[in-house]
Design a protein with these regions (language model features):
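Short, basic, helix/turn surface patches
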Residues: 132-144, 178-184, 238-259
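N-terminal acidic leader/helix
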Residues: 285-307, 311
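ATP-dependent adenylation/nucleotidyltransferase module used to activate substrates
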Residues: 2-164, 168-172, 176-180, 199-203, ...
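Catalytic subdomain that performs nucleotidyl-dependent activation
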Residues: 79, 157-237, 241
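Short alpha-helical "recognition helix" segments of helix-turn-helix
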Residues: 315-316
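Short acidic, Pro/Gly- and aromatic-enriched capping/linker segments at domain boundaries
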Residues: 321-336
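The feature marks non-catalytic terminal segments
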Residues: 210-284
Length: 345
């Protein structure tokens, strides 16, 4: 153990110690990272995970948290730290390499030409870029013997995505903590930063005076040059909306996050699962079907009359049921409706 510690660079060692010794970082970074891994079963024993590093604060912190989790050795797993260069300029590439060296993260860099592919796309270039990046990362991760890729999306990303899906997409969906790849057999995507707040990531970054990339793509650079980057991002607009709502309701962020853990399917008009759409009317009539067995029907009707309805007519109207049919079925077992008692006897 001493030999390992002596090989760690002094600055990296200080960063690692801050994660376990500073209360805020230990509770809000290390513990929440481990909690998400446990709650969503993100890591299984003996897996190899490709930690995908973009050069931003989120993914770099994720790399350090994975190293800390591995040091605990509660779950045996392997790590590869993967950086894709989609066409960074020299300065941005250098900054990623410098930060990785400074933080003692042994990165593997590979090149792609994604920026050139999307820079002239007018509609949704960011979405296309993200999709293409993910495909390249899956492919390289497989080549390295990994079965999962880990992305650095955090709690704030989750709630913003949830709200964006409603406001801009006309649907209800969220950013999932893990997903099966649809194009790479046996591969999964995990998001272990799921419980971590962006403000705590920023606090960690600033505590160590670290400088990370933001979005280094040419599309963003062009928009910033035109002064239009703010209006180009629906995510930024959604972020501002959440902050505005938070002024009158401090729990709004937690409520958005928790809403995706408390979906009442009985109270939605329609939903999709596995590519198939289900409408509440599909089962609406089935839910109102009365039991066929006369004795079960008797118990069901008498219970309803006792607890909720003053007359048989009211019950039948509410259930859209045929009163005569019910009376015939129950008369077959020698039960008739007594209006005074409001029950079948």
């Amino acid at each position: 153990m001493k030999k390992i510690i002596s090989e760690i660079k002094p600055f990296a060692r200080a960063v690692e110690q801050s994660l376990t010794r500073r209360r805020r970082f230990k509770e809000k970074l290390v513990h929440r990272f481990a909690q998400a891994v446990a709650d969503y079963s993100l890591i299984e024993p003996n897996e190899k995970i490709a930690v995908c590093i973009s050069g931003g604060k989120d993914s770099m912190l994720m790399a350090k948290l994975f190293q800390e989790l591995k040091r605990r050795n509660k779950i045996p797993f392997e790590l590869a730290f993967l950086v894709m260069d989609p066409g960074y300029n020299v300065d941005n590439r250098k900054q990623i390499e410098t930060n990785a060296d400074l933080l003692d993260v042994p990165i593997t860099i590979f090149e792609s030409d994604i920026f050139n592919s999307v820079v002239n796309v007018e509609k949704s270039p960011c979405y296309l870029c993200a999709r293409m990046r993910r495909g390249h990362l899956y492919k390289k991760a497989q080549e390295l013997g990994c079965n999962k890729i880990a992305l650095g999306h955090h709690y704030d990303d989750v709630i913003e995505t949830t709200l964006m899906s409603m406001l801009w997409g006309g649907q209800i969906q969220t950013m999932m903590p893990k997903l099966h790849s649809t194009n790479f057999d046996g591969m999964e995507l995990i998001r272990p930063m799921y419980y971590i707040r962006e403000e705590d990531i920023i606090a960690w970054r600033d505590a160590h005076n670290l400088k990370f990339l933001r979005c280094a793509c040419r599309f963003t650079e062009r928009l910033e040059g035109e002064g239009d980057a703010e209006s180009a991002s629906k995510r930024k607009e959604t972020k501002r909306l959440i902050q505005q709502l938070k002024k009158s309701n401090p729990a709004v962020e937690a409520n958005i996050f928790n809403s995706m853990h408390n979906v009442a399917l009985d109270a939605v008009i329609a939903y999709k699962t596995k590519g198939q759409k289900h409408h509440f009317l599909d089962s609406y009539k089935e839910e109102l079907m009365l039991p066929n067995d006369p004795m079960i029907l008797l118990s069901y009707i008498n219970t309803k009359l006792r607890d909720n309805y003053k007359t048989l007519d009211a019950l039948c109207d509410d259930l859209q049921a045929d009163k005569k049919e019910i009376e015939q079925k129950l008369s077959a077992i020698d039960y008739i409706y007594d209006a005074k008692l409001n029950r079948f006897i």
